[in-house]
Amino acid sequence: MERRIFGLETEYGVTCTYRGQRRLSPDEVARYLFRRVVSWGRSSNVFLRNGARLYLDVGSHPEYATPECDSVADLVAHDRAGERILEGLLVDAEKRLHDEGIAGEIYLFKNNTDSAGNSYGCHENYLVSRHGEFGRLADVLIPFLVTRQLICGAGKVLQTPRGAVYCLSQRAEHIWEGVSSATTRSRPIINTRDEPHADAERYRRLHVIVGDSNMNEVTTLLKVGAADIVLRMIESGVVMRDLTLENPIRAIREVSHDITGRRKVRLASGKEISALEIQQEYLAKATEFVERRGGDQTAKRVVELWGRVLSAVETGDLEPVAREIDWVTKLRLIERYQRKHDLPLSHPRVAQMDLAYHDLRRGRGLYGLLERRGQVDRAATDPEIFEAKETPPQTTRARLRGEFIRHAQEKRRDFTVDWVHLKLNDQAQRTVLCKDPFRAYDERVERLIASM
């Protein structure tokens, strides 16, 4: 299969609990968190030696954007590396707070909603050819993305006027459009703002903002891997039945509120079909496509897992995928906790548990606890994640950026970088423009590094 560039941008929730008198606003907490970054990067928006971008987003949300990866497996490791980097900042910030006599603990959550009903996202990026029909791509993808939460939602206890319900997705309640160029005001499923971060004549960046942030590496692998296969099918001209939804925004909420996958949603044709049936159609085509095209090991693992998740949902026996899929893992935890303490789903302690699942601090977060006990499956190893904290992917443009940053820092040279530019801030203001995200070696960059 042809290479594709992938990237994940994850916004994290941040809060602080206090034992003393002094209280900090979210802005102040975020500043403490980024103080170490600002001290060496002179900014709260920096690129790292591993090629990634780390910055404070609107509303004091720390955001980590992975470097460009050309395999889903690499992407999973770099996404987890982002968690470790932020966890390091958290430990540092807490120590500084305590040194200044502020008694409290900082929490970073890899989730998508806070208690005030605000939402922050996990944005997926897929490089696609400029020459395809972008409109058709979006049309075929939307029914897939609306129902994809069935296989990769993060799970959420939602308080409604009719009582608490367990939902598949955290993000579903906050999506208001199908396709749009805005990301915050209207929150579409697919964002169409045209910023390829590459040669604009050849490429376009498909920016999917409907997905949940996942704790489980296997769920992340499935989320991105399944979307990649569906994209490849569309690009290859695979004929798909028209599954256009009458109202994608209503459908995404209806799907989220039904963990059996059986609730019918209405198609534009007037026909009614369940989320499970829609996913089964995409899976059948994907399985045939991967077999015919001779997909790599990751693609084979993705369709196998996709099939197992849909079978588990169809039979109602979720146990076979409880170690791999976030919403199932969390549901099992909550159900056990409810039984043990005889609590209704609406109890505040259940909501607390829901949140604790996403706590990044490994000695404290629930997911981290499951991982340490070997109760969840993995798609990356600890050595791979450790390496991804420092080392960029070696087969994409991220390698050039990472090498440039490393050398400039070691030589104490002033520099500026973004996704496509590498610039030495000397008298000559030498800049190299790297428009090809697949290119990991470039003589111009080597010369720039050698000149330091």
UniProtKB/Swiss-Prot annotation:
The keyword Lipid metabolism does not apply. Disulfide bonds: none annotated. The active site is at residue 57. Mg(2+) binds at residues 9, 55, 63. It comes from the Bacteria. Its EC number is 6.3.1.19. One of its GO terms (biological process) is proteasomal protein catabolic process. Pfam families: Pup_ligase. It catalyses: ATP + [prokaryotic ubiquitin-like protein]-L-glutamate + [protein]-L-lysine = ADP + phosphate + N(6)-([prokaryotic ubiquitin-like protein]-gamma-L-glutamyl)-[protein]-L-lysine. HAMAP family: Pup_ligase. The reaction mechanism probably proceeds via the activation of Pup by phosphorylation of its C-terminal glutamate, which is then subject to nucleophilic attack by the substrate lysine, resulting in an isopeptide bond and the release of phosphate as a good leaving group. This is Pup--protein ligase. It comes from Salinispora tropica (strain ATCC BAA-916 / DSM 44818 / JCM 13857 / NBRC 105044 / CNB-440).
